[in-house]
Amino acid sequence: MAKKRNGYPLKLERWYERKMDQLIRQWQKQTNQFFQVHLRAYVTGGTKVLHDAANDDPNWANSIQQSLKLFSLAMDDTQDERTIESLVTRWLISVNNFSLQKAKRYTVTVGKEEGTIALNPLMGETVLSNYTKGKIAENTALIKTMKHRYIDQLKTDIYQNINHGGGVTDISHAINYRTGMTLRHATLIANDQTGKALSQLDAYRSQKAGYTKYVWRSMEDGRVRPKHQKLDGKTFSYNDPSGGDNGLLPGEPIRCRCYAEPI
């Protein structure tokens, strides 16, 4: 039986996804706690309309809006940017190390000098060092944007539910729904960004080492899109603007887990 290919860091993708999931679950927990403390009094158990709830304050709408502003501030404090950046940095260092180990294996296979191909972007190689910094900033921004979208959408959901007479159950469903949507977004980020980072690190190392061509390799499972199944095993030039998937290297198309094998 042929040995299963291991050119894509699936475990690192899943680790990245799990870490983002943990962040999102913290957001969900914070949301539920805030709702119980600051907004619970404005809703009923779901059997009465809004004007039956305990909100005798004639300025209840303004009070809710003020509470939702406070919600934004509270959520911003759930994790600071350094926490997110630290997570992203750990992920990217791991992807880089995976790429580095692959490069060393190719070095042994073809007999090239290890120093030529085994470049570490965190150890003084200017081009890769700059790429690393940019990728960390990009992914930190992606997670922060995902968080802000989660907060903004929940504020709208909660206000509309209260305004339309929704009960606790309705708001609980809204929180769960938004959390589920955000978890799926995290899955997309982990998959897409892992493939892109690996692709670009591998391509730079390979071309720096003198390789001009690569073989497109897929994961050879049921998730591989038909187009990439057809590309699997075919040879392309790194500098061909129409090669690969319309000029994109393996791993660069959205949600692509394919990888390049330099030859």
PLM regions with names:
Residues 177-181, 185-263:
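Acidic, glycine-rich two-metal-ion catalytic cores of nucleic acid-processing enzymes
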Residues 1-181:
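N-terminal leader/targeting and assembly helices and adjacent pre-domain segments
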